[in-house]
Amino acid sequence: MRILLSNDDGVFAQGLAELYKELKEDHEITVIAPDRNCSGASNALSLQQPLRMEQMQSGFYAVNGTPSDCVHVGVNSFLQQDPELVISGINHGANLGDDVIYSGTVAAATEGRYMGLPAIAVSLCAHTSDNFVSAAKFVRRIVTHLQAHPLPADQILNVNIPDLPYGEIKGIKVTRQGRRHRAKTMIKDTDPRGKTIFWYGPVGEEQDAGPGTDFHAISEGFCSVTPLSVDMTAHQSLEDVRQWITKI
């Protein structure tokens, strides 16, 4: 299978390297990733600057842009044939609940979807871990199954894997997105020149994390697989808004 592999942690990230090693024997892999860490980039595109691509010693390609840029330039310009699958990851850290809105990992997969391709975003629920190899093995299982049972071209799967050795992962659960409380207060500081600066604080605590959610599956030791749609219409609210708008 022809696979385009990208991420948001950058071309030198451990999760990217481990996933490439796990898949390269059975698949034709092209790796195009940002030249730096782009965590939190969401779906941003570099519209105000040209993109440059450089091949690394590893054979991976580094782009001076965002995760979405990497997939866009790969599919729309660099590759001679469209990939059959876009995979983004393995991300260093979870992408659960509201995280997907900000996630460059999910954004790279979403860009694949915009290109008309099935796509998977993969995250390990730890920033540093000895379990990236285990996570990569789990991804290989999903890819092997996908070969035999293809996904629709407009399908995005958001996969989160618990920080456990391979043999301790209990299985896979199909989940819905949970939800977090609002983010914690930003951290105010002063730079060396006496100017006020702000750092983002911790993410919000889990709010909707009950059975059926991605949060709950991870807490129980399962891999969570959440189907995502790029249609952000709140369909259940359409009639309420129609009624509301008539009163203006």
From Swiss-Prot:
Q: What is its EC number?
A: 3.1.3.5
| Reaction it catalyzes | a ribonucleoside 5'-phosphate + H2O = a ribonucleoside + phosphate
Q: How is the cofactor bound?
A: Binds 1 divalent metal cation per subunit.
Which InterPro entries does its entry note? SurE, SurE-like_Pase/nucleotidase, SurE-like_sf
Q: Which GO terms describe its cellular component?
A: cytoplasm
What are the entry keywords? Cytoplasm, Hydrolase, Metal-binding, Nucleotide-binding
Names of the cofactor(s):
a divalent metal cation
Presence of keyword Hydrolase: yes
Name where it's found.
Cytoplasm
NCBIfam families named among the record's database cross-references:
PRK00346.1-3 (NF001489), PRK00346.1-4 (NF001490), surE (TIGR00087)
What function does this protein fulfil?
Answer: Nucleotidase that shows phosphatase activity on nucleoside 5'-monophosphates.
Q: Which PANTHER family match?
A: 5'-NUCLEOTIDASE SURE, 5'_3'-NUCLEOTIDASE SURE
Q: What is this protein called?
A: 5'-nucleotidase SurE
Species in which this protein is naturally found: Pseudoalteromonas atlantica (strain T6c / ATCC BAA-1087)
